[in-house]
Design a protein with these regions (language model features):
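Short amphipathic alpha-helix adjacent to the substrate-entry channel of hydrolases
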Residues: 91-110
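Short beta-strand/loop motif that positions the catalytic acidic residue
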Residues: 218-221
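Catalytic nucleophile-loop/oxyanion-hole region of alpha/beta-hydrolase
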Residues: 89-92, 111-145, 262-266
Length: 285
């Protein structure tokens, strides 16, 4: 029954992905760390002709908030990091559409507008700050501060992996009381991750330091994705470190499908992730 309902949700959420109650939270009340350019609203990429809405530039990092109906809310939250090679954000495909799906399952969702283009370290600052800001506001939003996770797609999965392993690293000076809180995510989902195999002989990138505090990780990938080695090396490293990890690899599916219907991979990972979330967070009804 749960699987059947999940399929119905996946068929319907595109129709109301922009009708959910939502709001914006600016992450940096003053100057953005390390930036001299004045803050402005995100700049849309108007040159693309496919069915993906992209942001080409973000100078004022923010969270777009998607709140589920009270009748299904489970008190858990997920920060979503869209992909785009750290150059753009595939904002609907790997952001708002995913938020609508999470809402249908009862999760409060936050789509992270992190700095692009070419702001890889700034993006980590944005992700760390986002986790702290959500945790600081958890009480008034009906969120359990110990059930705030992060997920990402492609480069967004790279960012999520860095946030999940470098949470003890102070990457910016404290702004307010939120920065006294932990920026460790409670759980992590990496969907067709990229850039995790930058070490010697395509091993795990040395910027990811594993410890026993790394949260449980869910990884989904396809064998034909040009970036599939990232999933392999991350999964193996977590397994070798005896950390909690679940890895799914399908034979077909390429890269960049989000959860839109039409590909087996895009239709499969949400069902697997839903069950993993239930088991990891004990959110089953």
């Amino acid at each position: 029954m749960r699987t059947f309902l999940s399929i119905l949700f996946l068929s319907a959420f595109f129709m109301n992905s922009f009708s959910q109650k939502k709001d914006m939270i600016s992450l940096w009340p003053g100057t953005v760390p390390g930036e001299s350019k004045p803050k402005a609203g995100p700049v849309a990429d108007t040159k693309t002709k496919d069915k993906v809405f992209r942001y080409a530039e973000v100078t004022d990092p923010a969270l777009e908030v998607f709140i589920p109906e009270k009748s299904v809310s489970n008190g858990s939250a997920v920060i979503i990091c869209p992909g785009g090679g750290y150059n753009i954000l595939a904002y609907d495909l790997e952001g708002t559409e995913v938020a609508a799906w999470l809402n249908s399952l009862g999760y409060t969702a936050f789509v992270l507008q992190y700095r692009v283009p070419g702001k890889k370290e700034g993006a980590l600052q944005d992700a760390q700050r986002a986790i702290r800001v959500v945790r600081n506001n958890a009480g008034k939003m009906g969120i359990d501060p110990d059930k705030i996770g992060i997920m990402g797609f492609s480069a967004g999965a790279s960012l999520s992996a860095r946030a999940s392993t470098r949470f003890n690293e102070r990457t910016y000076q404290a702004v307010d009381k939120a920065d006294s809180l932990s920026c460790r995510p409670s759980f992590t989902m990496l969907i067709y991750p990229a850039y995790l195999d930058q070490g010697p002989e395509n091993s795990l990138t040395p910027e990811l330091t594993l410890s026993d505090k790394v949260p449980p990780v869910f990884i989904f990938e396809t064998a034909v994705d040009p970036y599939c080695n990232s999933a392999f090396v991350m999964g193996k490293a977590l397994r070798d470190a005896k950390l909690s990890v679940e890895v799914h690899i399908l034979p077909q599916g390429a890269h960049g499908y989000g959860l839109r219907k039409g590909t087996r991979a895009g239709e499969t990972w949400p069902l697997l992730a839903e069950q993993w979330l239930i088991e990891t967070l004990n959110t089953g009804k």
